[in-house]
């Protein structure tokens, strides 16, 4: 590889001016190349907040993207089933497994990794192990999906972000999906009508952040059994007693001990904020102090 014939400073300057997508492609070329990128581009790699695998119901084959701290996402790779009518594949050894690749040029160059039908899990695991080694522990690894028919691979250091629509929900399958999923980071329920509460033992209540959007319902069903840190509720109506009971139980210190933040919005009219604040005995934050802030993964 002629690149290594250049002086080190020239190599470093070249890598400094390469986009993340191209750095990622080069990281597969050889162990030596990957080590050089990690050495010279350490600060850029640490600037990445999330690496995300997205696999939805319409396209069950994931693509991989990253989100740096400037929030400008870059797609790095697609992972697809191998097509027999293509002949321009090349092979690379990824974490001990030989994987077929192509460079797609339909709209812009994109690295595509391929798997045969019986080895999708092993290909994804090998690519994830490569990503762990290349990007390191400073990056948060997320698996985003709205397809609860397919169980998420058990990957190291992976957290799950799930979107659930209420169209003909299969509650048994959904409960099984949650129970088999890796660490639950974020769940968004979008329900046009009434949603049955899950079992009090459901793993869905253990997600770090839950968002419930119910434009035509008055049933924010997650509050009573929630064990996570943050709840975001968007409903057409609330029972004030449900909210005040939740907050008072939270304040008691006996319940919801990991909980940090509750956000509520009512679609029809504003919430009776003063009434709720009076019932729960809320105190105002001093204007001179900075209130705490909370973030969730961008879906």
Model-flagged regions — what are they?
Residues 1-299:
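Non-core capping and flanking segments associated with repeat-based/extracellular domains
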């Amino acid at each position: 590889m002629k690149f290594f014939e250049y002086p080190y400073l020239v190599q470093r300057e070249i890598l400094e001016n390469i986009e993340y997508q191209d750095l990622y492609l080069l990281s597969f070329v050889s162990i030596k190349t990957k080590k050089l990128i990690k050495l010279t581009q350490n600060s850029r790699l640490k600037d990445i907040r999330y690496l995300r695998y997205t696999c939805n119901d319409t396209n069950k084959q994931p693509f991989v993207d990253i989100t740096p701290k400037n929030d400008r996402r870059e797609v790095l790779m697609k992972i697809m089933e191998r097509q027999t009518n293509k002949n321009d594949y090349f092979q690379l050894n990824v974490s001990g497994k030989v994987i077929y690749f192509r460079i797609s040029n339909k709209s812009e160059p994109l690295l595509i990794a391929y798997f045969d039908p019986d080895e999708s899990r092993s290909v994804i695991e090998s690519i994830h192990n490569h990503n762990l080694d290349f990007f390191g522990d400073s990056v948060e690894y997320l698996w985003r999906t709205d397809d609860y028919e397919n169980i998420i691979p058990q990957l190291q250091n992976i957290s799950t972000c799930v979107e659930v629509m209420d169209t003909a929900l299969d509650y048994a399958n959904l409960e099984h999906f949650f129970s088999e999923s890796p660490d639950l980071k974020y769940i968004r329920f979008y329900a046009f009508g009434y949603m049955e509460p899950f079992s009090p033992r459901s793993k869905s209540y253990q997600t770090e952040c839950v968002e419930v959007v119910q434009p035509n319902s008055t049933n924010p069903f997650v509050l009573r059994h929630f064990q996570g840190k943050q709840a975001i509720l968007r409903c057409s109506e609330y029972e004030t007693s449900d909210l005040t009971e939740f907050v008072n139980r939270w304040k008691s210190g006996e319940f919801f001990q990991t909980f940090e933040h509750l956000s509520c919005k009512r679609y029809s009219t504003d919430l009776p904020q003063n009434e709720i604040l009076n019932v729960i005995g809320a105190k105002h934050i001093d204007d001179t102090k900075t209130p705490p802030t909370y973030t969730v993964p961008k879906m």
